[in-house]
From Swiss-Prot:
GO cellular component labels: cytosol
Function field: Necessary for normal cell division and for the maintenance of normal septation.
The organism's taxonomic lineage, starting at the top: Bacteria, Bacillati, Bacillota, Bacilli, Lactobacillales
Cofactors required: Mg(2+)
Gene3D superfamilies: P-loop containing nucleotide triphosphate hydrolases
Binding locations of GTP: 32-39, 59-63, 77-80, 144-147, 176-178
PROSITE patterns: G_ENGB
Keywords, comma-separated and alphabetical: Cell cycle, Cell division, GTP-binding, Magnesium, Metal-binding, Nucleotide-binding, Septation
Name the record gives this protein: Probable GTP-binding protein EngB
EngB-type G domain mapped to chain residues: 24-195
Annotated residues for binding of Mg(2+): 39, 61
Source species of the chain: Streptococcus pneumoniae (strain P1031)
Transmembrane parts of this sequence: none
Length: 195
């Protein structure tokens, strides 16, 4: 698929099914805990400074944000999970919204699950990966913030993450940095393959 990534815009924000775009365009969802670098990932992948607003305040994305890319596909930014300063009720509401999208959306082709390369995956990260495997949703693991770790230690951190996730070697695992753009081409290759 030929894709002009510069032709990208935020299309809409949705709280439930009735607000989703009503067409056949394939979608790639982006999931990860708060402040893992989802907005930076979107901006880097689409070569934009602030198409997706980055925030110092975790838990800012509370809706599903749909980004139209060249009228050929969409990124869907899912609310960040695991942020403690949101009420339990609010978290449950997000959980239902995310689950409804991931399990019922026919346009969904794969989920990019973002984890922080510097740390072991959280219980939420593990749960998300298990959820995606259970529902047989194709998953691409993207380990962000690779620039914060010396290159010589990347393998060690990658192994620790894979072990904690009980990683399936048939899934893609990509080391990524929005600062150096490392992993950007690999991420696009993996995404386009799923479409």
């Amino acid at each position: 698929m030929e894709l002009n990534i510069h032709n990208a815009e935020i299309l809409l924000s949705a709280a439930n099914k009735s607000h989703y775009p009503q067409d056949e365009l394939p979608e790639i969802a982006l999931a990860g805990r708060s402040n893992v670098g989802k907005s930076s990932f979107i901006n880097t992948m689409l070569n934009r400074k602030n198409l997706a607003r980055t925030s110092g305040k975790p838990g800012k994305t509370q809706l599903l944000n749909f980004f139209n890319i060249d009228d050929k596909m969409r990124f869907v930014d899912v609310p960040g999970y695991g942020y403690a300063r949101v009420s339990k009720k609010e978290r449950e509401k997000w959980g239902c919204m995310i689950e409804e999208y991931l399990t019922t959306r026919e346009n969904l082709r794969a989920v990019v699950s973002l984890v922080d390369l510097r740390h072991d995956p959280s219980a939420d990260d593990v749960q998300m990966y298990e959820f995606l495997k259970y529902y047989e949703i194709p998953v691409i693991i993207v380990a962000t913030k690779a620039d914060k770790i010396p290159r010589g230690k990347w393998n060690k951190h990658e192994s620790a993450i894979k072990k904690k996730l009980n990683f399936d070697p048939s899934d893609d695992f990509i080391l990524f940095s929005s600062v150096s753009k490392a992993g950007m081409d690999e991420a696009w290759d993996a995404i386009l393959e799923k479409l």
